[in-house]
Amino acid sequence: MSYVCLICGAEVDIDTEKSLVQCTNCGGRILIKPRPLAKKKRVKAI
């Protein structure tokens, strides 16, 4: 799974076998799942 570090913003791949939840770039342990971009709904003009 790919996560995003909250401190430095780097993408981090996490090993589920070792269960190391830590950023490889800055060493931060606060990681969030990247959200998919919201789809904009088109509204027809009246």
UniProtKB/Swiss-Prot annotation:
Residues that hold Zn(2+) according to the record: C8, C23, C26
A single GO molecular function term of this UniProt record: zinc ion binding
Statement: the UniProt record of this protein carries the keyword Aminoacyl-tRNA synthetase: no
Major localisation: cytoplasm
One CC-aspect GO term: DNA-directed RNA polymerase complex
Reaction equation(s) it catalyzes: RNA(n) + a ribonucleoside 5'-triphosphate = RNA(n+1) + diphosphate
Record's keyword terms, sorted: Cytoplasm, DNA-directed RNA polymerase, Metal-binding, Nucleotidyltransferase, Transcription, Transferase, Zinc
KW Transferase (keyword) present: yes
Subcellular localization(s) per the UniProt record: Cytoplasm
Function: DNA-dependent RNA polymerase (RNAP) catalyzes the transcription of DNA into RNA using the four ribonucleoside triphosphates as substrates.
Subunit structure: Part of the RNA polymerase complex.
Protein name: DNA-directed RNA polymerase subunit Rpo12
Gene name for this UniProt entry: rpo12
